[in-house]
Structures are given as C-alpha cells and as structure tokens.
Design a protein with these regions (language model features):
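Glycine-rich phosphate-binding loops of nucleotide-dependent enzymes
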Residues: 1-125
C-alpha cells in the first residue's frame, strides 16, 4: 500500500488503521507519534509532519513508506525495488532497515536488481 501525496505523514500513517477504527472518530495520537518517530529515526527531511508528502523528495517518501510498513511488525515484508530513484545515503538507510528486520526474524522478500546488494542483504536467492 502506497502513500497519498495530498495527505500529511499522520494521515498516511492512519491509512493502515482505518479498518480497525471504531465509529466515525479516529484516534490521531498514535499515528501522530508514529509519524514523529519515523521522521526522527529515519531523518525524514520535511518542514513538518503536517506537510503533504508530495512536497518531500522521493527518498524521503520512500523512508516514510518503509518506516510505516515496518512499524506494523509484519511477519513477512515484501518490497519491490525499494531504493529506485533515491540517493545513495537513503538507499543505505533503507537497506539497513531491511537488514534489521531480517535479524528480527521477519521474512523479507525483495525484488532488487543490484547484484552487490542482493549478495550483501539476502540470505536466500531465487533467480
């Protein structure tokens, strides 16, 4: 599930929890705290978590997306070209996040075209 460009970080965090909501009122405290945590931990460059994500660079959008999905504590994480179009520093951050998930026992399924990254990041390769 992607991000909505006209929505801010908090609203994009809430996308994953709309179906769990009770009634027409949604709790924004948890998603706001998650947005702040992702912004700080992944060094997302944005003037505010209230700014629309379309105003962010591609690398920062990727950080928000990967951070949101990892925050769901998945058992399986499927990513396709997670660093396409991002700068080298952001790609290292994203690969580090995926590696941390692998160490936690999460099955990380990747579609990646860079063989060096594949050999460094993954423990099982299918071609």
């Amino acid at each position: 599930m992607g991000l909505v460009g006209d929505m801010d970080m908090t609203d994009n965090m809430m996308i994953r929890s709309y179906r769990n909501g009770k009634g027409p009122f949604l709790d924004r405290k948890g998603p706001r705290a998650l947005a702040e945590k992702i912004k700080d931990q992944l060094e997302v460059m944005t003037p505010s978590i209230s700014a629309p994500v379309r105003q962010m660079s591609g690398g920062n959008v990727q950080k928000v997306l990967v951070g949101r999905e990892i925050a769901q504590n998945p058992k399986v994480l499927l990513v396709a070209f997670p660093t396409r179009g991002v700068d080298i520093n952001t790609s290292h951050v994203i690969y580090q996040l995926l590696n941390e998930q692998k160490k936690k026992g999460v099955a990380v399924v990747c579609v990646i075209e860079d063989l060096d990254v594949v050999l460094e990041l993954l423990s099982l390769i299918h071609i």
